[in-house]
Structures are given as structure tokens and as C-alpha cells.
Amino acid sequence: MASQDISYQYKSQQEHYPNEKISDSYVQKQNSKLTQVIQQCFSKAVKIIIQSRTVPPAAASPLLNPALHDDSASGNKINRWFNLHIQNSQDLPKDDLKLWKSNHLQSMPPMIIETYLDLRQLTSSQTIVLNDDNGNPWAVAKSGGKKQEVVLERWLIEFDHTDASGSIVDELPLIYKQAIILFRSIYGFARLMPAFKLKKRLLINKSSTKLNKLTIGNKILDGKQPISSKGRIGLSKTIIPRQMLTTDSHMSQKHFQPIQTSLGTLKISIAYRNHCDFCIHDNEEVLSTHFISMDSTPLTESGHGHTKANNTSMSVSPCSSGHPALREGSPTKRGTPPTAIQPFKVGSISNSPPPASHTPNSGYGGSLERRISITSNRSTSNASLFAMLRNPRSSTSSTHTTSNIPIAPSSSSNSTNATNMNNMSYPRSISSSHGSNMQHDDSMFSNPDSTTNTPRFSSSFGSRASRRYSNTSVRQSTPVAASTLTGGSPLSGLYIDDDISEFVRSIDSKADLRFSNSYTAHNSGEPKNNMGSPSGGDALNKFQMMKSHHQQLGDSVNASLILQHNNAVSGSGSGFGVSNSRHSSTSRKSSHSIRSPSPSMSGLYDVVPGSYGRSERRSSSGAGVPGQLSLPSGGGLAAHSPSATEPTSAATITPRETNFNFSNASFLRSASKLSATPVTSTTTAHATIHSVTGMATSPSLYQRTKVGSSIHYENVFEDDDDDEMVMKKPVVTSSGRDEEQLQHKQMKVVSIEKDAGANNFDDDDLLFTMSDMNLTKSS
């Protein structure tokens, strides 16, 4: 066979180089030497790799030990090929290299050298673990298990005869020099790999009881045969979880520079594990390490159903990846998806706690949740604090968001309760003005321990779109609805402990703390049987009393905005625009109930006195007769306009008339009292509707009129003689008119002071007196 191969090489060389005269003896000699060099490359690679894994480092290199050069000093022979002296290891049987010494280069199979960790000597109480870069131990295998070996690295040495250079130049010296560099590189790289560090550590700690059971073995395998992974942990299987690795993979590969010849190419490569820090631990030590890791790892809190932000999606625990028993005790994902605590509260309902039979620490979860709720509502009003105390399990929304909070209904609800649950997806809100028209089902948000609901109040003015919503107490008031709150329902955790219930009842016993939405439900057309509180009217009146200071500020802003809008009109329409501002403010008062005191309008003249002064200057320059204030015999007040067809509001004092008398304190006091009294029309026939101009500062300003208009009332106490006097009043010059106006105002101030002292009565007395006057006049 060798002669046939040489003749084949000779023919190929003749084809490539027809002009060359090559003797058969020279070609045969070159090919035989090249075959011997390639075979020595396989043998030298095996000796370097196995020696770096089994022989102590002091005897590994003959350069460090000159005594190894003497054959008589050692019983083993020294292999001096490629200028690298290595002892022939007795541990390496000659039969293992038989395939790569007897066969020809074309039939030489690839050689695979595996280095593995032998686990057969472990006792029943020991477990092998692998430490990662952070020092965390990860269980590999237990003693007596199915896995007996852990593959650390795999070398591949092959001669590819298909990749030939085809050169006939004297290549042996060049190939030999390249082989010297290659094996010196392999010698150095083999001592820098993780497997060599493990072998060195095992030799140093050979007397240790924890490491004397571990040994490193080597195998030489035929590369043409399939490699079985039965009974061992293969190189492709990771021990440390991928998410805990600092590198892209748990293994690495290295390809050395190949050597090309005329017969083929020699290639050497390696694949190895990046982590080889193996140790032996006792089973008790592994369990204690596992429990310590569980304590240090953030777990899911079952009390209020939220997890830490650094929890991964899968359970990753050291010393538990290789043991089913340990994996059962490791922290895993709960059956229900946890909800994370949001940095900005948006009014979400906290998740339900565990059932009563599994809540030994439910008090801790509830107290933590209450602390979160109190912290989020620290900057709110007292009313929101009352809402938090009544429902400590529900978290109210922040004042910086207007997002909706959907609440999924329970699957066990009936049709009636399902409808109520669907209505809960809307944002809950109670307007700070006279009542909101938002149609929501409040039965689901009533508190069974109290007689009223506890809302949070927003500002009394601002546009409708900028209203801030808040969640009210989410509780069931009926037994049928309460049965729907099962353990799996999102609302099942909204309950109050016994001690908290007693405290809430003591708070609810005070009538000053009770609020209701019955007035809102009445305006929105909802039936009263859906409300959870019986005393809705009284609670609404108390709510309106608390809102008086907000209403006063809203009226002031409303008047200023309307005045700015009407000041652009001509001088004749200036006074009428100011009168319209009073109509708007009085129409707002009329929406209050009779029992609640209306806010005083005395602050109206302190806010915008400059606007009134400008209105006076414009009206004085225009044509027309100023409005007159007269006191009829019945004790009421009537404002006479220049034209009988222009209706004005009863008891209206225009700012144009009062601007000249700010220094008169008695006049301001009387005007404040008159403006605080409610204005009511005597009959519906005398009421006329006019469109309202200007910007509305409260959504409840036009609740009573769906077309967005305020009601102006005609003066029913006007005397025909006074009307004729006003109509027949001669027109005078500008200077004469100013003097007449000044005299008229002085007389009017005196009459108002007298009437204010004599007619200081309640709201109910005023209505009764005006009704009597109306009956007297009509009769």
C-alpha cells in the first residue's frame, strides 16, 4: 500500500511539474519522513495534554528539571521531538495510540482527547458543587447519582488529506519548525486553561478531606465514532444558569494555526469550560447554603401580592439546580401574577391577601399596606384621611393623575352584580361644587360600616376637563354582592380587621364626619335605593357648609372673568355686563339648598376694584340714565333700569354704584349682607331666561338649566309712577348729569343704611316676606 501511495504521489507531482525530473526514491523518502512527522505530531500532542492534566507541574517541563535529560536518572524515556522534552507517561497505554501509528495518513482518523472530572469516589453524604464568578455554589451532582463524569475540555487533532499544498520543495525543515512553534503554543496554553488550575488546586489540597475524592481523567477517542453522553454531564450542558453567567456562553473554543503539507493539513482545536472551580460539600452544608440564599433573595410577599423589582422570571437559586428536592423548596413564581408597587400612585386597588387559613402574617401585610396608603395621602385633606381610615385596604389615587382604574369583575357574580362591577371601571369622583352629574353606580362604593360614602374633594373651580378623580371606598353593602368577593377575586382583600372596624365605627358615630352622594344621585337620575346611606340630605348640607370658602373664591374669579369680557363693550352696555355678573353669581346661589348659608360676596369688591372703576369711567362717558336703587313699601329692594323692557335681578347692587363709596364702611357692610341673601323668584311667570356670557368656573354652575343659561328675574315691585318718572326724566348736559348722579347716590346710601338696620332677617324670613308682599300686591 505504501508503494501504491508513493506512485500516486509521483504521478501527481509529474502532472503539476512536468518539466521536473524527480526520482522515485526521492519522492518515497520525502513522503515517508513526512508521514513519520505527522504521526509524531499526534503522539506529542497526546503527551503534552495528558501530562498537563495528570503529572505534577515540577516534573512536567524538562527545562525546569535538568535531571530529566539523563536517561539513567529516570526509569522513563524522554521524548525529545520538536525540541520539547517530555517524559513518556506510563499511564498512557500504547494500544490507545495504535490507530495513529499504524495507519497511513489518508486512513488516519481524527483524534479526540477528553479531560473529565471523575465523581465515582464521592460518598453518600457528599455533593459536588461549582462556584461561579461571584462565589455562589451551584449543585452539579450527588453521590450515587446517574452522572459519574463531568467533561471539562475536548481536544480535536485531525489530518485533512483533502487540503494539500501540492509543493515538492524540500518542506520537511519548514514543517518541523512550524511544529515546534505549534507544540510550544499548546504546551503554554494547556497550562493557562481552567482545567489545569483545577488540577493544580487538587494537588495542593490533596490532603484535604473535601478534595481528595476528586480526580481528573483523560480519554483518547476515535473521532469517527459517535460520542455518547450517557452517565456523564457533557460539554454542551451548562451547570451555572445562563442568566448568571458573566460571558456569552459557559464554554469557549480555540483554533491553533494549522500546518500545511504536500500530503494534507494538520489541524488542532479545543473546546473547554470557562468555570472549573469544583468543590465537595456535605449535604447539610448545601441545605444551609440554600436556605441562606433564600433569605437573602427577595421573595414574593403573599400579604399584599407584590414582588421586588430585581426578581427574575424563573427561579434561580444556588445549590438547587441539580436537585429536584431542593428545587421544590426554592422560591418560584406564584400561581397568581403579582402586581408591583407603583412609584406614582394611580389609585390602584391592592391585590387580595391569602385566605384566612393561610395568613399567619396577614397582620404584617395589612399594616404595611396601611402605611403605604397613609404615606401616599399625607399631603391630602382631612376628608381623604377619613376615606383612608374607613377603607385601609384600598389605596386612593394621587392628585397628579386622571387615569382610569379598571377593576375586573368576579366570575361568580350574578347579572346584577356583574353590571355593578362593570361600572367600577370608571373613575370615581365627587365634584367640589353643588353636585356632579356623573352617572356612576355608587352601590359598589358604599361602606357597610358607615351610613355614607367618603369622597375626596377636588378644587371648587377649574375647567371640567381638568377635574381630578379619586377612588372612593370599594365595599359591598348587600349580602348578595358580598358573596361575590371570593378568594380569587381582586376585591376579596378589601376587608377591615376587627380592631379597625371598631375604630371606624367610633368615627362614623360622629355626624360631622358623614358625607353622602345622595344629592348627586338625585340630580343624575339614579334611584335612591342604590345608595348605601339613608341620611343623604343632611349630609349634603354639611358638605355644602364646608365648601363655602371654596365657593367664595370661585365666585370672585367668575366675576372677574365676566367683567373682563364685558369691558370691551360700549359704555351703555357696561353696566348691564356688570349686572350679568351679579346674575351669574346669584344663579349660583340659587343652586344651594335653603338650609345651607350662601357664601358672602363681600370679597368680590376687594378682588377687582380696578375693574369696577374702569367700568364706571366708561359708563359715565356714554349716553343713558344710571340705574336707581329704591326701597318699596314692602321692605324689598328693587333695581330700576333705564328701560322697562330690560329685566334686572332683585336686590342687585351694581359695582358701578358702589365704586364711589368704598370709604363708607357702613355701606360696605350693608351691601355684603344684601348680597349674601338668596334671591328667589316669586312666580314662574316673571322669570325670563337670558344667555350667559363669559367663562364658567365650575361645572355645577348650569346644572339647573340644561341650555347653559342663567335666569333673570323681573322686578315685580316696580311702581308705575316710578317708571313714568324715569321715562319722562329730561335729558341734561354732561356736567349737570354728573352733579345729579352724585346727589342721587348720596340719598341712596342713606336709604340703604336705614333699611339695612331695619331689615336684617334670615333667609326663610325674606322668602316669607316676599311671598306675602306678592300676595298683597296681586290682590
From Swiss-Prot:
An example Gene Ontology biological process: piecemeal microautophagy of the nucleus
Polar residues bias (residue ranges): 308-320, 426-455, 471-488, 520-533, 642-652
Instruction: Kindly state which keywords UniProt assigns to this record, in alphabetical order.
Output: Autophagy, Cytoplasm, Protein transport, Transport
InterPro entries this protein is in? ATG13, Atg13_N, HORMA_dom_sf
Pfam families linked to this entry: ATG13
- Compositional bias per record (Low complexity), positions renumbered to this chain: 394-425, 456-470, 593-602, 620-632
Q: Where is this region: Disordered?
A: 298-368, 392-488, 520-541, 571-652
| PANTHER family noted in UniProt | AUTOPHAGY-RELATED PROTEIN 13 (PTHR13430:SF4), PTHR13430
Q: What does this protein do?
A: Activates the ATG1 kinase in a nutritional condition dependent manner through the TOR pathway, leading to autophagy. Also involved in cytoplasm to vacuole transport (Cvt) and more specifically in Cvt vesicle formation. Seems to play a role in the switching machinery regulating the conversion between the Cvt pathway and autophagy. Finally, ATG13 is also required for glycogen storage during stationary phase.
Which family does the record claim for this protein? Belongs to the ATG13 family. Fungi subfamily.
Official protein name in the record: Autophagy-related protein 13
**What gene does the UniProt entry assign to this protein?**
ATG13
